From Swiss-Prot:
Its main location: cytoplasm. It is found in: Cytoplasm. Transmembrane segments: none annotated. It comes from the Bacteria. Its EC number is 5.1.1.7. Pfam families: DAP_epimerase. This is Diaminopimelate epimerase. The active site is at 76 (proton donor), 226 (proton acceptor). Belongs to the diaminopimelate epimerase family. One of its GO terms (molecular function) is diaminopimelate epimerase activity. Pathway: Amino-acid biosynthesis; L-lysine biosynthesis via DAP pathway; DL-2,6-diaminopimelate from LL-2,6-diaminopimelate: step 1/1. The record marks 168, 217 as: Could be important to modulate the pK values of the two catalytic cysteine residues.
Length: 288
């Protein structure tokens, strides 16, 4: 029987099991199965996945993120805010501004601290990737995919594809509560046009500075929030002429609000909370 200490944290209800790999050890070959086991709501701790906080050669810390089906993702906006909180409060970093390595590249985090506790984290998510090759999706590699039609159940849905280090398909609807989240979501996620699958967001524009947001996450299904998805939604809204670049946009997710801005210099900034739920020790056994 093996075990490791963990901290369960959430960003707007998007919860992960966080493991400090400066102190703990999980064999590389076991990571996918351990993520699946620990995320199980009935037989594990229950979460949207597992995130490892690891040493890095190029930044103070590195984030590795696993979905609850065991697949490894390249980035996670809510996860990055929680990693920033954990790293500062556990003295893995000293400054309130620092970098975090991800499989999608290096991002910059800035934490707001009150009485030694991080109350807010802002992440510079970098520039969005907009070509088919970067997302990735099938088709002519250097072309963008903006407001293209997809036929489902005799209804045409127009979506825009954006990568924030992971792929997103953003669909504008009149009412997110009536959106086909659990039906169209998995169909698009696994469609052959996306070789690495895709996260699917349904967006309802409220005004020039606010939107409602619901998400079907690749490898996890319906979640309360998706930070990279919120960034992609704002980028897609600007590309479609629905919002103005440079303004801070309030994104109302099922789990709460994020503040997102696609600044003129090119990068996308995300600001929001990160919360600790509990600490514990998880025991597991990998069958031979």
């Amino acid at each position: 029987m093996s075990q490791f200490s963990f901290t369960k944290m959430h960003g707007l209800g998007n919860s992960y099991i966080y493991v400090n790999m400066f102190e703990e050890q999980i064999p590389e070959e076991d990571l996918a199965l351990v993520a699946e086991k620990v995320s199980n709501i009935n037989t594990g701790i229950g979460a949207d996945g597992m995130i490892l906080i690891c040493p890095s050669d190029v930044a103070p810390v590195k984030m590795r993120m696993f979905n609850n089906d065991g697949s490894e993702g390249k980035s996670c906006g809510n996860g990055l805010r929680c990693v920033a909180k954990y790293a500062y409060e556990h003295k893995l970093v000293e400054d309130t501004v620092f970098t975090i390595e991800t499989l999608a590249g290096i991002v910059t985090a800035e934490v707001t601290v009150e009485e030694g506790k991080v109350t807010l984290a802002k992440i510079d998510m970098g520039a969005p990737r907009l070509t088919r090759a970067e997302i990735p999706m099938l088709g002519e590699g250097e072309t963008p995919f903006i407001r293209e039609n997809f036929l489902y159940n005799n209804h045409r849905y127009a979506f825009t594809a954006v990568s924030m280090g992971n792929p997103h398909a953003v669909i504008f609807v009149d009412d997110v509560e009536q959106a086909p989240l659990t039906t169209l979501g998995p169909v698009l996620e696994t469609h052959e046009m996306f070789p690495e699958r895709v996260n699917v967001e349904f967006i309802e524009i409220l005004n020039e500075e606010e939107m409602n947001f619901r998400v079907w996450e690749r490898g996890s299904g319906v979640t309360q929030a998706c930070g990279t998805g919120a960034c992609a939604a704002v980028v897609a809204s600007i590309l479609n002429g629905k919002m103005e670049r440079g303004k801070e946009i309030t994104v109302h997710l099922a789990g709460g609000d994020l503040m997102i801005a696609w600044i003129e210099e090119g990068n996308v900034l995300m600001k929001g909370p990160a919360e600790v739920i509990c600490h514990g020790v998880y025991e597991y056994k990998i069958e031979a």
